[in-house]
Amino acid sequence: MKETELWQRLRLHLGADYFRVWASEYSHSALGQRTVVEALSDGVPCKIIWRAVWAALELPARDR
Protein backbone atom coordinates (compact mmCIF):
# COMPACT_ATOMS: atom_id res chain seq x y z
CA MET A 1 0.00 0.00 0.00
CA LYS A 2 1.24 3.48 -0.86
CA GLU A 3 0.92 6.44 1.47
CA THR A 4 -1.52 8.13 -0.92
CA GLU A 5 -3.84 5.12 -0.68
CA LEU A 6 -3.63 5.20 3.12
CA TRP A 7 -4.69 8.87 3.16
CA GLN A 8 -7.50 8.15 0.66
CA ARG A 9 -8.86 5.37 2.85
CA LEU A 10 -8.66 7.53 5.98
CA ARG A 11 -10.56 10.30 4.20
CA LEU A 12 -13.18 7.86 2.94
CA HIS A 13 -13.87 6.37 6.38
CA LEU A 14 -13.45 9.46 8.57
CA GLY A 15 -14.56 12.27 6.29
CA ALA A 16 -12.72 15.16 4.69
CA ASP A 17 -13.06 17.43 7.72
CA TYR A 18 -11.79 14.96 10.31
CA PHE A 19 -9.33 12.44 8.90
CA ARG A 20 -6.17 14.53 9.27
CA VAL A 21 -7.03 15.55 12.83
CA TRP A 22 -7.72 11.93 13.77
CA ALA A 23 -4.48 10.78 12.12
CA SER A 24 -2.46 13.27 14.12
CA GLU A 25 -4.17 12.85 17.50
CA TYR A 26 -5.37 9.25 17.95
CA SER A 27 -2.66 6.99 19.43
CA HIS A 28 -2.80 3.30 18.52
CA SER A 29 -1.55 0.58 20.84
CA ALA A 30 -0.86 -1.56 17.76
CA LEU A 31 1.55 1.15 16.59
CA GLY A 32 3.39 1.46 19.90
CA GLN A 33 1.16 4.29 21.13
CA ARG A 34 1.96 6.32 18.02
CA THR A 35 -0.43 8.25 15.84
CA VAL A 36 -0.72 7.56 12.13
CA VAL A 37 1.40 10.64 11.44
CA GLU A 38 4.08 9.56 13.92
CA ALA A 39 4.12 6.01 12.57
CA LEU A 40 4.56 7.29 9.02
CA SER A 41 7.37 9.56 10.17
CA ASP A 42 9.04 6.59 11.88
CA GLY A 43 8.92 4.53 8.70
CA VAL A 44 6.20 2.06 9.67
CA PRO A 45 4.82 0.46 6.48
CA CYS A 46 1.45 1.82 5.39
CA LYS A 47 -0.02 -1.69 5.34
CA ILE A 48 0.76 -2.09 9.07
CA ILE A 49 -0.68 1.35 9.82
CA TRP A 50 -3.85 0.57 7.90
CA ARG A 51 -4.33 -2.68 9.83
CA ALA A 52 -4.17 -0.70 13.08
CA VAL A 53 -6.63 1.89 11.75
CA TRP A 54 -8.95 -0.81 10.41
CA ALA A 55 -9.05 -2.49 13.83
CA ALA A 56 -9.49 0.78 15.74
CA LEU A 57 -12.40 1.85 13.57
CA GLU A 58 -13.91 -1.65 13.60
CA LEU A 59 -14.34 -1.58 9.85
CA PRO A 60 -15.81 -4.52 7.92
CA ALA A 61 -13.51 -7.23 6.60
CA ARG A 62 -14.01 -6.03 3.02
CA ASP A 63 -12.16 -2.81 3.90
CA ARG A 64 -9.08 -4.55 5.23
What are these language model-derived features?
Residues M1-R64:
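C-terminal alpha-helical interaction appendages
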